[in-house]
């Protein structure tokens, strides 16, 4: 029996071998304690990431990088549950139309090679990020995901001022979303790259190159950019951890005709993207059009028969 989990998101077809799932499962176990030895994870991708602007990233390699570079309001834990990330807690009104988040104090962005910065992460950064999502000039693919936000359609088509968008800051650490209609998936959508914070002053300082180079990218997540060259994107974890500490996204240039399964067997990478749809004994994660799905063998004898594990792997960030 196969069990699929689907969430609207990407707009192109990809296929990633399930070795990713096996590796993620191993990292979950490692997270329970034990060795602090540095662990590396290597992705073979079609192209080196080129755009790390989370509000516009859509290509697979860019999204993979953004999901690890940026932290948002919420994340999924090892049990697949939504838990606070950059916020301490949140409240939802009884009618489901108002979401209030209370951010952690003292958070700052991280620069290239782990350099400390003076850019504090505040509620205004999320306000600015969502204004960018609904700025017609941004052409963000995430606007459709957050269409329930009050006045979003009018702001997007240019008939309303961005200041009327239903996202506001009350002081530095309180963020409020007002929806025009109930969206029971709203919290889950806040894990998408488009919902990641963006410091307006830093964005303006990049003069149109935000997310296009190491110098024009700041991290708010678990990893920061260590190096970004024609050879690949190399990320390191901000704090020592028994989980993955080094994440490498490199282009497969040795033999583009190889399937993902062959790449993993021959090139010793941790994961690879494949659009051949070739039959394999490995499980796969599929991304198609505006829907992506994780497919698991959920038979009684499979480790993936445990629903909580499937849920965790559906939302895990390395």
Which ranges hold each PLM region?
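Ligand-site clamp/hinge motif
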Residues: 204, 231-279
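Alpha-helical secondary-structure segments
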Residues: 123-128, 172-176, 246, 266, ...
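Aromatic- and charge-enriched surface segment that lines or borders ligand/interaction sites
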Residues: 89-145, 303-305, 310
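Surface-exposed ligand-recognition segments of extracellular binding domains, strongest
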Residues: 80-108, 139-201
């Amino acid at each position: 029996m196969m069990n699929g989990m689907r969430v609207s998101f990407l707009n192109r077809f990809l296929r990633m071998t399930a070795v990713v799932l096996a590796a993620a499962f191993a990292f979950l176990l490692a997270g329970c304690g034990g060795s602090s030895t540095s662990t590396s994870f290597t992705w073979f991708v079609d192209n080196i990431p080129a755009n790390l602007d989370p509000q516009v990233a859509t290509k697979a390699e860019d999204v993979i990088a953004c999901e690890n570079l940026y932290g948002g309001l919420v994340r999924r834990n090892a049990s697949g549950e939504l838990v606070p990330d950059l916020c301490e807690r949140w409240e939802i009104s009884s009618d489901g139309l108002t979401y209030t988040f209370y951010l952690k104090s003292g958070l700052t962005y991280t620069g290239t090679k782990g350099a400390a910065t003076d850019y504090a992460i505040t509620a205004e950064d999320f306000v600015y990020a969502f204004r960018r999502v609904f700025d017609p000039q941004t052409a963000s693919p995430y606007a459709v995901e957050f269409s329930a936000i009050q006045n979003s359609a009018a702001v997007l088509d240019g008939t309303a001022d961005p200041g009327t968008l239903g996202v506001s800051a009350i002081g530095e650490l309180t963020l409020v979303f007002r929806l025009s209609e109930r969206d029971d998936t709203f919290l889950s959508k806040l894990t998408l790259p488009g919902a990641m914070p963006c410091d307006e002053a830093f964005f303006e300082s990049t003069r149109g190159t935000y997310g296009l180079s190491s110098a024009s990218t700041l991290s708010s997540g678990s990893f920061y950019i260590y190096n970004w060259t024609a050879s690949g994107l190399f990320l390191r974890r901000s704090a020592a951890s028994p989980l993955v500490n080094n994440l490498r996204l490199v282009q497969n240039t040795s033999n583009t005709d190889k399937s993902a399964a062959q790449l993993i067997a021959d090139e010793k990478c941790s994961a690879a993207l494949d659009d051949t749809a070739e039959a394999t004994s490995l499980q796969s994660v599929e991304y198609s059009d505006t829907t992506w799905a994780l497919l698991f063998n959920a038979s009684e004898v499979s480790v993936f028969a445990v629903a909580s594990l499937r849920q965790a792997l559906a939302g895990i960030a390395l």
